[in-house]
């Protein structure tokens, strides 16, 4: 998205020359855009969620579990992100956005435990986390945050059929304490299905930008364009940082022109941690309203 010099100048001055900073959509510097979510939206899946990020981004995720070959670590999570035909991107055959989003989601999933997904010496659950971007006003919008939040909610609602194996009486989902047998039974009763484990390690991604002396959360395209740098930062429910990636270097229009300092980098991490934990805490309320429509998330 090409912005004019007057647009860049106005955005930069509004943020850096006023106290408090004036953002073009009226938010405070540490405020996310309005967002809402819904869970259990896709019949036939093991878990699902849908998230709207402002009026510009909407993502739906379905989680499907299948029995597959065990890995040395146990089972595995497999991410996939597609862009709906209704979303305009330059060239669907060569565009890097789907692969970038898939890679980012896979990085978050790789933090989750998979050892317990193995239930025989050679078989384990393979968890497919499939996302579709069904609305994006621009490929440069904040898709990462919506994607990670939708994945978090979908995994929270996911249930796996209970597995029984010979000579094992205490089964959660799978078990690393089994007799060396390839026999197993899958319980088809949904009410006996069990939740995923270790989801406290799943992260939500918060975007933060440094614009001269100001740090802003969830930057717009205009704000990212005048920032020295924009980071995507993964935050777990505990506030721990699990993921960092530079996703924009706007060139610092009319800025100091200097690279950010270590101290500023730490400030960016701390800001993301605070906002991310609030978002995860607020989003947990949605889980009580399965299938009842969209609910606002107010971190």
UniProtKB/Swiss-Prot annotation:
InterPro entries named among the record's database cross-references: ExoRNase_PH_dom1, ExoRNase_PH_dom2_sf, Exosome_comp_Rrp42_subfam, PNPase/RNase_PH_dom_sf, Ribosomal_Su5_D2-typ_SF
This protein's record includes keyword Translocase: no
SUPFAM superfamilies: Ribonuclease PH domain 2-like, Ribosomal protein S5 domain 2-like
Keywords annotated in UniProt: Cytoplasm, Exosome, Nucleus, RNA-binding, rRNA processing
Pfam families hit by this protein: RNase_PH (PF01138)
GO biological process: exonucleolytic trimming to generate mature 3'-end of 5.8S rRNA from tricistronic rRNA transcript (SSU-rRNA, 5.8S rRNA, LSU-rRNA); nonfunctional rRNA decay; nuclear mRNA surveillance; nuclear polyadenylation-dependent mRNA catabolic process; nuclear polyadenylation-dependent rRNA catabolic process; nuclear-transcribed mRNA catabolic process, 3'-5' exonucleolytic nonsense-mediated decay; nuclear-transcribed mRNA catabolic process, non-stop decay; rRNA catabolic process
Compartment annotation: Cytoplasm; Nucleus, Nucleolus
Function per UniProt: Non-catalytic component of the RNA exosome complex which has 3'->5' exoribonuclease activity and participates in a multitude of cellular RNA processing and degradation events. In the nucleus, the RNA exosome complex is involved in proper maturation of stable RNA species such as rRNA, snRNA and snoRNA, in the elimination of RNA processing by-products and non-coding 'pervasive' transcripts, such as antisense RNA species and cryptic unstable transcripts (CUTs), and of mRNAs with processing defects, thereby limiting or excluding their export to the cytoplasm.
Name under which the protein is recorded: Exosome complex component rrp42
């Amino acid at each position: 998205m090409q912005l004019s010099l007057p647009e860049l100048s106005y955005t930069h001055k509004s943020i850096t020359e006023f106290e408090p900073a004036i953002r073009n959509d009226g938010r405070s510097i540490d405020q996310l855009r309005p967002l809402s979510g819904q869970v259990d939206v896709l019949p036939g899946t093991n878990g699902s969620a849908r998230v709207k990020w402002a009026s510009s981004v909407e993502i739906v995720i379905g989680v499907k579990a299948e029995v597959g070959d065990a890995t040395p670590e146990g089972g595995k999570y497999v991410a996939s992100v597609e862009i709906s035909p209704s979303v305009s991107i330059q060239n669907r055959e060569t565009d890097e956005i789907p692969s970038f989003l898939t890679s980012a989601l896979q990085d978050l999933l790789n933090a989750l435990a998979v050892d317990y997904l193995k239930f025989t010496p050679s078989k384990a659950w393979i968890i497919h986390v499939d996302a579709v971007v069904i609305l994006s006003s621009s490929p440069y919008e904040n898709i990462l945050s919506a994607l990670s939040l939708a994945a978090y909610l979908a995994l929270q609602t996911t249930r796996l059929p209970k597995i029984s194996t010979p000579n094992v009486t205490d089964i959660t989902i799978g078990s690393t304490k089994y007799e060396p047998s390839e026999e197993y039974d899958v319980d088809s009763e949904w009410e006996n299905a069990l939740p995923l484990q270790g989801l406290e390690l799943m992260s939500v991604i918060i975007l933060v930008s440094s614009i001269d002396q100001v740090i802003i959360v969830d930057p717009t395209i205009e704000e990212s364009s005048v920032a020295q740098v924009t980071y995507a930062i993964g935050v777990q429910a505990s506030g721990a940082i699990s993921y960092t990636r530079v996703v924009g270097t706007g060139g610092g229009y009319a800025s100091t022109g200097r690279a950010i300092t270590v101290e500023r980098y730490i400030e960016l991490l701390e800001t993301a941690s605070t906002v991310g934990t609030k978002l995860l805490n607020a989003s947990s309320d949605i889980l009580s309203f399965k299938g009842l429509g969209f609910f606002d998330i107010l971190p």
